[in-house]
Every structure is written in C-alpha cells, then in structure tokens.
Regions:
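Short, basic/aromatic recognition patches
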Residues: 1-20
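Short solvent-exposed loop/turn micro-motifs enriched in small/polar/acidic residues
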Residues: 14-16, 28-29, 78, 107-109
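Short beta-strand segments
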Residues: 16-48
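Short, surface-exposed beta-strand-loop junctions and turns on beta-sheet-rich folds
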Residues: 27, 51-53, 130
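Short hydrophobic/aromatic-rich beta-strand segments that constitute the beta-sheet cores
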Residues: 45-46, 64, 123
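Short, structured beta-strand-loop surface elements
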Residues: 49-112, 118
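Charged phosphate-binding loop/patch that engages nucleotide di/tri-phosphates or the phosphate backbone
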Residues: 113-130
Length: 131
C-alpha cells in the first residue's frame, strides 16, 4: 500500500465517475452516491430537494469518498475528503457552478449546488488481490 500525496489525491478524485457522500441524519449515518467535479481544491455536486440537501444544510460536516482501479496495472485507489458542505445560494456562485462540467447519472431534477471545502484529504493506492 502507498500513501498518496495531496496533489495525487486531487488528480485521482477528478477522474472519479461517482463518489460517495457520508452525512449525519438525526442519529444515523447516511451514504449517498453523488456525481462530483473538482473545482480548484473543492468538490462540487448537485442535488434536488430531500434528505441529502437537508443533511448538508443542517449538519455541514461531511465525508466524500471516491475510488477506482486500473486493470492494466492491477492497482486500486481510494481518496477520502473530510470537510464542510456549503449549499450555494449566491447568484454568482450558482452561475459559476452551472458552468462546471458536472454530469449527473440521474434524470431526477437537481436544482441545488453544494461545495465541499476540505479540512483534510487522504488517499491510498494498493495492489488488487488476484482472488
């Protein structure tokens, strides 16, 4: 296993097709799949009304995780970002977010943007077992 430096973590995170968002909802932890885009040293995703939006608005501490693998090299990676989520509500912030190359897998309407400002980012690369 190799511990990744911050620059490599951001590079890998920018290639992830889907990430996972972990939030506290009441007394429970919830994990949601999200499509993300790296914007500078932040992560942006879009969402519709519902539990995910309510959770990041009330309890802004979140964890974003993404991973991937390379069949050619037999290696996999995982990046974890711990940070604070901000729902974008200023018109110029929303306008900038709408210009980002954020592609959603879902056809569900997603009219809100959220930016995660990291407190920490860590990553690992490791060999995938043959079994």
């Amino acid at each position: 296993m190799t511990i990744l430096d911050e620059a490599t973590c951001w590079d890998l995170l920018s290639t992830a097709a889907v990430s996972r968002l972990a939030v506290v909802v009441g007394d429970d932890l919830e994990i949601f799949p999200i499509n993300t885009v790296v914007d500078g040293r932040t992560i942006v995703f879009s969402t519709g009304e519902g539990t995910k939006l309510a959770a990041v608005t009330i309890a802004r501490n979140v964890v974003v995780e993404a991973d991937g693998h390379d069949d050619a090299t037999g290696e996999a990676w995982s990046v974890v970002v711990k940070g604070e989520a901000d729902r974008l509500d200023r018109f110029d912030d929303i306008d900038k977010a709408e210009q980002l190359p954020l592609r959603s897998w879902s056809t569900h309407p997603k009219q809100w943007f959220v930016r995660v400002k990291p407190r920490s980012i860590t990553g690992r690369r490791f060999a995938v077992s043959a079994g």
